[in-house]
Amino acid sequence: DEQIGLEQTPDEFVNKLVQVFREVRRILKDDGTLWLNLGDSYGDKQLFGIPWRVAFALQADGWYLRQDIIWSKPNPMPEPVKDRCTKSHEYIFLLSKSPKYYYDHEAIKEDCSESNIQDFMRRKTLNNKGKGSGTYEEARPDLARSRSDYMPSDFKRNKRSVWEVTTKPYSGAHFATYPPDLIEPCILAGCPEGGVVLDPFGGSGTTAGVALKHKRKAILCELNPDYANMVDDRIKDIFPHVNQYDLLDILEE
């Protein structure tokens, strides 16, 4: 059986993923990015540390490791454990092929909290000579350009690296699928409209559904034909108004 995830040791699993993503890097555009979601597992009373093992192995293989993002789950799966905390997060790693890459931070800006907005309104502003000009409310035109983390027009801020996303079961699959809301920022920030999103582990097609919803194209690779057969239904579940698929190909080997 060639399916990844059935290896005898963590090192074998890590090595297989490195090989897969080496091929991904080969065909990726020079300004492309890789967004990798990984959970962890236990064995013999020890946490394997799979996400970071994979991240460092990919970095050693030539990828630029740009950021770790925490997927915080408000509704994690219960665990019958009494000697540690219940696991309620996974990792998403942002990696790139080159030092400079496509990343649309404007597309995924998030709302500021009310306390942030009130604090912003009370802050003193400085003109280009370093002299105070009153609060933002009193001197809106003189707002310092350096305060780029807060946009005065709509009070948006750069997206933070902890994403709280509720897990959502998908009845069409008997295996775990990540929620569309989790990967939406990855696609919006990492791929322009009309671009192509590649998922080497296509599964039920969640990535394709989100990509098509946001006017991107998608290529899925899936070893298991049973999973591949779910793609049409999953796309309709995510994007009910789709008339025709921009899905380029589903590779079954």
Model-derived segments and their meaning:
Residues 242-253:
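Acidic, low-complexity intrinsically disordered tails
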Residues 1-238, 247:
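Core catalytic lobe of class I
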